[in-house]
C-alpha cells in the first residue's frame, strides 16, 4: 500500500526484480519504503528470471534497454558471445541464463489486469506510477 503525493492511498502491486547487493536496487527499495510502498522483491540470483516476465519486459521496455552493456557481466563475456546478441531472441536467451546482465531494477507496477514495466531507477516515472497506476 502506498501513500500518493496527493494524500490518497493507492494499492499498486509492485514487484521489484534485481539482486540484493546491487546499489541501485538497494536505493530503489529504500525509495519505495520511504514512499510508504510495500513491494515484493524477486532475487535474480536465488529465483532466476521467469520466462513470462522476461517476455513482458522485452515487449514493453525493449531488449536494448534491458541488456546492461555497461556492467561487469557484459564486459566479462567473450567477444563472440557479445556479437551474437543481435535481436530480442538472442538477448532474451542470454538474460535467462545470466540474469546479472539485466539492467536493474526492473519493476512491474500492476493494477488489476494492467501492468507497466520500468527499468532502472527513474524517480519521476515512479512517482507517476504511484499516483496514476500502471496506465501512465
Regions from the PLM with identified roles:
Residues 1-8:
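N-terminal amphipathic/basic-hydrophobic helices that include classical n-h-c signal peptides
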Residues 3, 27-30, 66-67, 78:
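Short, flexible segments with low predicted structural confidence
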Residues 10-35, 39-47:
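Local sequence-structure signature of Cys/Sec-based thiol-disulfide redox active-site neighborhoods
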Residues 44-136:
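Thiol/selenol-based redox catalytic cores and closely related redox-interacting motifs
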